[in-house]
Amino acid sequence: VAKTALACTILPDSPPARLIEWSRAAEDAGFSGVFMTEANNDSIACSLALGLHTRRIKLGTAITNIYLRHPNLLANEAAAVQEFTGGRFILGLGTGHRESNSALGIEMGIPLTRMRETVKTLRAALEGGKTGPRVSAKLPLYLAGVSRPMVKLAGEIGDGVIFNFFPPARVKEALGELAEGAQIGGRDPKHIEATLFATAFISDDLEAARRPARKLLSRYGALKFYGNMMAHSGFEREIAAIRAAGRDGDAAVKAVSNELIDATLLVGSEARVRERLHELCAPGIGTAIVFTNPVNEDRNAAVMRTIRALKQ
């Protein structure tokens, strides 16, 4: 893996002070960046806070939901972070999921069209002008890509792409789609960074690590975008069973095979996780963004263990 970044978010067991501590530890360990996820928190505001407590490490969002903010407001927020952090910010953009957006009363329309329009407005605003930031800002825009059309769009108009839950075969396929999109946009794909978001469950007890991993995949496999991608990647049987389970959570968990876990997550001992990370990050992946979930220990211990295990 060329570079490794840490991913984190504000949770009951990871308050702001912990995020600052982890970011500093990741910086000292040679990690390339810290990416904030967006789960009932503001990923951009959190990135600014972490930037003010670090010196060199990149700050990013993985991802910021484009449906929650007007593009011009998003441009001003992101430009402010870029200015305060000395140009260390990467804005990762995603559409979220129909299931979560509809719960907020958001009608998504056509996500691909919305993403294209958002990036266009962002680019124009970031160049300055009446609706743009106080000063023009050079800001890398990374697009979360799951489906083939969104990955191609990232190649056409983005500075990078963020993959998540991608088995190695899907990574290889998606890198080809990214190159196709770059060709459409008249761009060199070498200038578009491909990143892989990888969730880790680290424990010397493999079965203990697989239990929470199974629960995670039973939830994400039920989502349309991820479920379709996993089914397309050779896990049709598992996804069909997860969807058939409906609200029966136990049945959905049982439908997740060890093969699906190993193809999409980092699970097991520190040595096994390092090996799996190398296998998941095919040639062409520039940065692995690792998010850690604890296994029979508190989150702080789990995150610090991950930082030590993946020290650059």
Language model features: what each stretch is:
Residues V1-Q312:
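Active-site-adjacent structural elements that line small-molecule/cofactor binding pockets in enzymes
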